[in-house]
Swiss-Prot record:
Residues 190-227, 287-289, 333-341, 560-562 are lumenal. Residues 21-62, 432-466 have a biased composition (Low complexity). Homodimer. Component of the gamma-secretase complex, a complex composed of a presenilin homodimer, nicastrin, aph1 and pen2. GO terms for molecular function: aspartic endopeptidase activity, intramembrane cleaving; endopeptidase activity. The PAL motif is required for normal active site conformation. Residues 589-609 dip into the membrane without crossing it. It comes from Dictyostelium discoideum. This is Presenilin-A.
Length: 622
């Protein structure tokens, strides 16, 4: 037994390990010595018991060969239950002074230290090293990632249910622009068609398409043939333009792609917008000179290009996208009736193929954009409703930099703590076996002049009200307010220097503050780095256009058809968005709304309106 104690004491003396858990025992021992000065025999017995506790604690210390820690890592382990004692689970401290030991055979060793205070017990696991290696830091990182993945799985399970509830906000956000577009188209068509000239032109076009009253069969055949041919030509143009866009994006010809998109936007805003502007001036009987007209159209076109393809306020960008949809819908609605119905039907069928089939051009475009983690390079209306935190690449890079800054090597070359009013009580006790253990308890009452020097020898002090935290402890304390709150009179935390070791150990309040600040910093970093944003709903401008074409064609007949078709389109879009939330994949937005709209239009025009006329002629009121 005595030989084991001698070997352990020599090991302690060689590596200068001092277990803080014994400080509490020594403190109690000193109190016993001060209170019972006359009982020397009892003091010797207490000393023997304390020395035995020292030997047992040193014997139970974990000696681990860890291949170098040059990172300073703090992370919180979630155990699933609350503990009454405040504990800092893992603090990895790398001390270069300890790495200069002559004995390299041990490599590194670990000892558990416990510091007892009046209100709490703080467990500190201190790891020393004498060689530099990245392997352990990678292991620590993988361990943290594993814990975070488990937490993310739990969070996903918790947030999976309310996601469908919050999905209603995105549905409403996409219904607003669709309704605005259709209302503007209806108002424009009703205003234009109310004039005498436009009414006469509409009658002449309808008579030409009907083929005259003489031969109704040949007129019907010609009308169907013309509508089919026009629809196929229009579909061929759509397929060609979509294929060109996919090829340009697939081969990363982004300049050509955006030049093409900008050219079409200028054509829509400048030419179609200018022509519609002339019609409105004629309808309102307003005069305008050509110079002012050109300036207005030019500013409108260039402003649209800037807002759509560059930076602009969100509402302005969405306003220009709605304007483009309105312009296209107004001109497509001027096509003959059966050509319009044929185009809407064929485009709806093609939309199913383009989005859902494996070889569809739109599906290829979507999959390519997802693989590259990029937005689809097209004029697409984005609902931009993110439930949770908005996430972008800049925030990702900043969070990664912050996470890398958390892993900083803690090099303490020199720690000098000067105390003006220090009361030192030194008690030297001799064991009966002849082994001498010197236990020193240093009680610091006033810490007025503390100085912590970094590895370059530069001093960090608080002068002229400027407080700079130690650079070796980056994320313990986040700002000056927390530094002042958890610091002594000069702005630095109250640390104590462990005897025979260059290890900083804080008192109870300082350690509690460090634990709370570190845990809150880690939790905020985890939430910023691992919280993924909710995907927003994006609807192509083509969907806006064809919805508006359908309701615009209905507006050229009766106001009753406008309301019924409007309800049918919104119902189809709503069902499509519900399916989008269920299947969680890209779905075509045209088929359900267009099919419902066409069916409701003919039912309203052939049945409901005739029924309303019948009730009105017979003066039957329901």
């Amino acid at each position: 037994m005595k030989e084991n104690e001698d070997e352990i004491n020599k090991t302690d003396e060689k590596y200068k390990i001092k277990n803080p858990s014994n400080n509490g025992n020594n403190k109690n021992k000193n109190n016993n010595n001060n209170n019972n000065n006359n009982n020397n025999n009892n003091n010797n017995n207490n000393n023997n018991n304390n020395n035995n506790n020292n030997n047992n604690n040193n014997g139970n210390s974990n000696l681990e060969n860890i291949e170098g820690l040059n990172k300073y890592n703090i992370y919180k382990k979630k155990k699933g239950k609350n503990e009454s004692n405040t504990s800092l689970n893992n603090i990895y401290i790398s001390s270069p002074n300890l790495s200069e030991r002559s004995d390299n055979s041990i490599g590194s060793y670990c000892t558990n230290k416990t510091m007892k205070s009046e209100n709490s017990i703080i467990n500190i696991e201190t790891l020393f090293r004498d060689s530099v290696s990245e392997q352990n830091s990678d292991e620590c990182g993988s361990k943290v990632d594993k814990d975070l993945d488990e937490d993310d799985d739990d969070d996903d399970d918790e947030t999976e249910v309310p996601e469908l509830v919050d999905y209603s906000e995105m549905i409403v956000s996409i219904l607003y622009p669709v309704c605005i577009t259709m209302v503007i188209v209806v108002l424009a068509i009703r205003a234009i068609s109310s004039s005498t000239s436009k009414n006469s032109q509409i009658v002449e076009i309808s008579n030409d398409n009907s083929g005259g009253n003489g031969d109704s069969s040949s007129g019907a055949d010609k009308m169907v043939f013309d509508s089919v041919v026009n629809s196929l030509i229009f579909l061929a143009v759509i397929i060609l333009s979509t294929t060109i866009m996919v090829v340009l994006y697939k081969f990363k010809l982004m300049k050509a792609l955006y030049a093409w998109l900008m050219g079409t936007s200028i054509l829509l805003l400048g030419v179609f917008g200018g022509f519609l502007f002339l019609i409105l001036l004629a309808y309102l009987n307003l005069g305008l000179d050509y110079v002012t007209f050109v300036i207005v159209v030019w500013n409108f076109s260039v402003g649209g290009i800037v807002c759509i393809f560059w930076y602009s306020p969100k509402l302005l960008n969405q306003g220009y996208l709605i304007s483009i949809s309105v312009l296209m819908a107004l001109f497509f609605s001027r096509l003959p009736d059966w050509t319009t119905w044929g185009i809407l039907s064929i485009v709806s069928i093609y939309d199913i193929f383009a989005v859902l089939c494996p070889g569809g051009p739109l599906r290829i475009l979507i999959e390519t954009a997802q693989k590259r983690n990029e937005n689809i390079p097209a004029m697409i209306y984005n609902a931009s409703i993110y439930i949770g935190m908005i996430y972008n690449e800049d925030n990702l890079e900043n969070n990664n930099n912050n996470n890398n800054n958390n892993n900083i090597e803690l090099n303490i070359n020199e720690v000098d703590i000067e105390n003006n009013n220090n009361n030192e009580d030194e008690n030297k006790n001799n064991t009966e076996d002849g082994n001498n253990n010197n236990n020193k308890n240093k009680n610091n009452n006033n810490n007025n002049n503390n100085r912590i020097e970094n590895e370059n020898g530069a001093e960090n002090s608080s002068e002229n009200g400027s407080i700079t935290p130690p650079p070796t402890i980056p994320n313990f304390i986040k700002d000056e307010k927390e530094i002042n709150r958890s610091s002594g009179s000069n702005g630095f935390p109250n640390f104590k220097k462990c005897a025979n070791d260059n290890i900083l150990i804080g008192d109870a309040e300082t350690n509690d503050e460090i634990v709370s600040n570190a845990e809150s910093s880690i939790d905020s970093t985890i939430s910023e780095s691992y919280v993924k944003p909710k995907q927003s709903i994006r609807l192509g401008l083509g969907d806006f256009v064809f919805y508006s074409v359908l309701i615009g064609k209905a507006a050229s007949y009766q106001i009753t058809t406008v309301f019924t078709v409007f309800i049918a389109i919104i119902t189809g879009l709503f069902l499509t968005l519900i399916l989008l939330a269920v299947f969680r994949r890209a779905l075509p937005a045209l088929p359900m709304s267009i099919i419902f709209g066409i069916i409701v239009f003919f039912l309203t025009f052939k049945i409901l309106i005739q029924y309303i006329y019948f009730l009105g002629e017979n003066q039957i009121f329901v």
